[in-house]
């Protein structure tokens, strides 16, 4: 069996070496996501024979990432066979997730008609043109511009944007604690945010917040694992302050995403309100 070890901060360089070679437009290949969510998903990794193997699950149900090598070298079929053997040794089926089209074709070529493929709609990433989110030009985004213009008019001189620093990190986390208290389904995200904030410099994470009359009304965290894409890991705002979500989205993108082509706002997890919001862009 493969000798999997729990993911820790010390695995950052190893994960980056394998997973940042190519943008697969799936946030689960982001080293930041792998590390900050490791505790929630019980993520483990193993490097063997030039491949990095990653598995997540509680021991009863485990999900494997496709084995990745440096420069697509090595025996991919043999690497997948190791996953199959590992799963079968535990009496499980081998379930491989986060396949892009290239990896799906590679897997099917190596194992014709052996795997059944299903779309994971709730886990699909929302990828946007970066300049579109920065400028909000066009008819589709007219409503977003209106929300921002109303916010700027209503709160002129009363709001300010701050980058995440050691000086405001506790305020940032306190806001998210208060926000998450209203919805238990975001407790796991709170744990991930705690890891991200405690190690934001080491992990290369950028953050931003908006204050209104000195009080935080919106926060966000993101990172850039690939040359052409920025990933937004966390975004929260006050529902009772119209325009706050649109403001934090645009303000952060303006300051951090000018030099990338895409912005990945991750998945909606099947949450109706989140899906509606992300589709609206």
Each model region followed by its residue ranges:
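Short catalytic-loop micro-motif centered on adjacent basic/acidic residues
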Residues: 95-96, 160-162, 262-265
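Conserved active-site alpha-helix within GNAT-family acetyltransferase domains
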Residues: 103-117, 269-281
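Aromatic (often tryptophan-rich) hydrophobic motifs at membrane interfaces
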Residues: 206-281
């Amino acid at each position: 069996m493969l000798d999997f070890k729990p993911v820790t901060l010390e695995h950052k360089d190893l994960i980056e070496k394998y997973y940042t070679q190519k943008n697969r437009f799936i946030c689960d290949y982001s080293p930041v996501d792998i590390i900050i969510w490791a505790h929630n998903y019980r993520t483990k990794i193993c490097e063997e024979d030039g491949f990095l193997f990653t598995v997540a699950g509680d021991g009863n149900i485990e999900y494997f990432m496709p084995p990745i090598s440096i420069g697509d070298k090595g025996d991919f079929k043999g690497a997948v066979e190791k996953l199959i053997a590992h799963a079968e040794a535990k009496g499980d089926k081998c379930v491989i997730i986060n396949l892009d089209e290239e990896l799906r074709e590679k897997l099917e070529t190596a194992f014709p008609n052996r795997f059944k493929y299903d779309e994971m709609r709730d886990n699909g990433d929302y990828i946007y043109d970066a300049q579109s989110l920065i400028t909000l030009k066009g008819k589709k985004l007219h409503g977003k511009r209106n929300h921002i213009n109303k916010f700027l008019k209503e709160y002129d001189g009363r709001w300010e944007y701050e980058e995440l620093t050691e000086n405001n990190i506790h305020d940032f986390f306190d806001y998210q604690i208060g926000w998450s208290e209203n919805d238990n389904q975001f407790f796991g995200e709170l744990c991930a945010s705690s890891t991200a904030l405690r190690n934001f410099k080491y992990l290369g994470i950028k953050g931003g917040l908006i204050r209104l009359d000195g009080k935080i009304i919106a926060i966000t965290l993101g990172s850039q694992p690939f040359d052409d894409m920025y990933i937004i890991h966390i975004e929260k705002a006050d529902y009772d302050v119209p325009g706050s979500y649109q403001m934090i989205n645009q303000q952060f993108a303006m300051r951090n995403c000018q030099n990338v082509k895409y912005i990945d706002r991750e998945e909606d997890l099947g949450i109706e309100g989140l899906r509606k919001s992300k589709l609206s862009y």
